[in-house]
Regions:
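Short linear loop/turn motifs
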Residues: 40, 47-48, 255-261, 294-305
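Pocket-lining segment of extracytoplasmic ligand-binding domains
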Residues: 68, 104, 155-247
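Secondary-structure end/capping motifs
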Residues: 212-294
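Conserved C-terminal helix/tail region of periplasmic/extracytoplasmic solute-binding proteins
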Residues: 284-335
């Protein structure tokens, strides 16, 4: 038998969020090994901003991040998005892993977004939490100036709510699930709602992507297999999460995993281009960013399209991508 080549070493950055868990699952279940990779996960970062800073500093080869990559590209980082860790290739809106939580005496009413007016709301600037909150305000007919936004890292949001430093927060899981268990009288004002399209990409710097196509395909096959395992085994997946996300308790992980598996889809379709375009459009309209970039220059779908063709079984439990949004290599998105 031919000797197996030494596995290819990879360092991948993740954020302490339940929707990132395909990475540790692929490590623990041996999927990376199966495809010839030796993957080290760089510590869970608080947000994608921190993960991208680590990528820029050369601490990692690739990261999983979303909205913060928009700001990074506009500041001159040449990033390429080549897969989705969370989002949806079959429909436009997907934000099931996000929620807005209010404190019990805040005067904010469950289901009534207009009651946010005049309140202090915690979010993490430049992340999907921020984009989601902006989307909620827009849905309520409010503007960002109708509330006081407080820039807060996710690990500190529940403390801020308990101490009444803020009236509410918008965040990704597990933070909202923890609030509902640990903050007396906490109110889930809204969860998800298809208010925005989730942005969660596998990202690396362009020179690295140009040199490592075969490695990227191996990586995407391994995490796609981890995704499918997670969709089929949410309870076991939640248990793995407790070993990787600091302070994550099993009951919280299991609840969060039920939301997470609703949008675990590594595939790329025209919807994912639109999601990135729409996020920029919203952020620019509301003055968060000054300029925008062409999404076609920063999404490279050929690697995941190759994996979809070679390993169709890894996606067989997902809804098929509608023909009108299915793409081929060389696809150009036009808004």
């Amino acid at each position: 038998m031919a000797q197996a080549k030494d596995p290819i070493k990879l360092k991948v950055g993740m954020v302490a969020a339940v929707d990132m868990l395909a990475l540790p699952i692929a490590v623990e279940r041996g999927f990376f090994e199966k495809y010839g990779l030796d993957v080290t996960i760089a510590r869970p970062y608080a947000t994608g901003v921190d993960a991208l800073n680590a990528l820029q500093a050369g601490e990692t080869d690739m990261v999983q991040a979303g909205v913060p990559a928009i700001g990074a590209i506009l500041r001159g980082m040449d990033l390429v998005f080549f897969g989705n860790f969370s989002g949806n290739a079959t429909k436009l809106g997907s934000d099931a892993t996000l929620a807005l939580i209010a404190g019990k005496d805040s005067g904010i009413v469950k289901g009534d977004l207009k009651s946010l007016k005049g309140k202090k709301v915690a979010t993490s600037f430049g992340t999907i939490n921020h984009l989601y909150l902006l989307g909620l305000l827009e849905k309520a007919g409010l503007t960002p100036s109708d509330v006081t936004l407080v820039n807060t890292p996710p690990p500190e949001m529940n403390v801020a709510l308990l101490a009444k430093g803020v009236d509410a927060f918008a965040c990704w899981d597990p933070v909202p699930v923890i609030a509902m268990k640990d903050v007396p009288g906490a109110i889930e004002v809204i969860r998800g709602g298809d208010v925005i399209s989730y942005l969660g990409f596998n990202i690396a710097l362009r020179p690295w992507v140009e040199k490592n196509g075969a490695t990227i395909e191996k990586f995407l096959a391994a995490v796609s297999e981890a995704d499918q395992w997670m969709r089929k085994n949410p309870k076991q997946a939640a248990a793995i999460g407790t070993r990787w996300i600091p302070g994550l308790k099993l009951d919280v992980a299991e609840t969060a995993m039920q939301y997470n598996i609703q949008q675990v889809d590594r595939r790329i379709s025209a919807h994912n281009y639109r999601a990135l375009w729409k996020a920029q459009d919203t952020l620019q309209r509301l003055g968060v960013i000054k300029s925008v970039f062409d999404v076609n220059k920063h999404i490279e779908p050929k690697f995941i399209l190759g994996v979809m063709k070679t390993y169709p079984d890894l996606f067989s439990d997902l809804q098929p991508i509608p023909a009108d949004v299915a793409i081929e290599p060389g696809f150009v998105f036009k808004p």
